[in-house]
């Protein structure tokens, strides 16, 4: 895309993606990180320096370090650097490396609880993201009427496709 002066300009979607990748690569930590209790779990909140454009709720995959995994923290900061408020909760059973048929409901209940708390989700729309094992649960929760109208974007990285096989 070219501007009237002949300079090349990236569409805003590409600018956002570029900014995210650059922030991730540089391991930038703009804004503020706070950990708060929420129900029976902990939630990391990454607040950008300016008014957030949207709120991301990111559910970690099956990993013992959960929200404290350095890769997850780095992604939280990178998303924050693009002007997003980021919430990263621990899902107790997933962090404990347990697999059960109760997890889809556990994740959905947690997401609805977070999204319904206006002190945590300060924007009208939300972005739901997840990686690996938790992605199928986040996808299922996004279809719930309590969340569907507010979900603007889904970002699922390396998720499983068969919830029945995952939960067996």
Language model regions located:
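Short beta-strand element of the alpha/beta-hydrolase
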Residues: 53-61
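Glycine-rich nucleophile elbow surrounding the catalytic serine of serine-hydrolase chemistry
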Residues: 130-140
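Short amphipathic alpha-helix adjacent to the substrate-entry channel of hydrolases
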Residues: 70-87
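N-terminal cap/lid segment of alpha/beta-hydrolase-fold proteins
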Residues: 3-54
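Alpha/beta-hydrolase active-site loop
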Residues: 98-120
């Amino acid at each position: 895309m070219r501007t009237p002066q002949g300079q090349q300009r990236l569409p805003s979607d590409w600018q956002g993606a570029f900014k995210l990748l650059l922030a991730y690569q540089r391991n930038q930590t703009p804004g503020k990180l706070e950990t708060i209790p929420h129900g029976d779990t902990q939630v990391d909140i990454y607040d950008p320096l300016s008014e957030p454009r949207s709120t991301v709720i990111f559910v970690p995959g099956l990993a013992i370090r959960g929200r404290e995994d350095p890769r997850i923290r780095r992604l939280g900061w990178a998303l924050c650097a693009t002007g997003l408020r980021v919430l990263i909760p621990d899902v107790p059973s997933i962090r404990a490396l347990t697999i059960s048929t109760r997890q889809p409901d556990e994740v959905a209940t947690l997401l609805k609880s977070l999204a319904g708390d206006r002190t945590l989700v300060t924007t009208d729309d939300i972005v739901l993201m997840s990686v690996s094992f938790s992605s199928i649960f986040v996808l299922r929760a996004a279809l719930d009427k309590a969340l569907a109208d507010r979900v603007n974007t889904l970002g699922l990285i390396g998720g499983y496709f068969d919830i029945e096989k995952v939960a067996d």
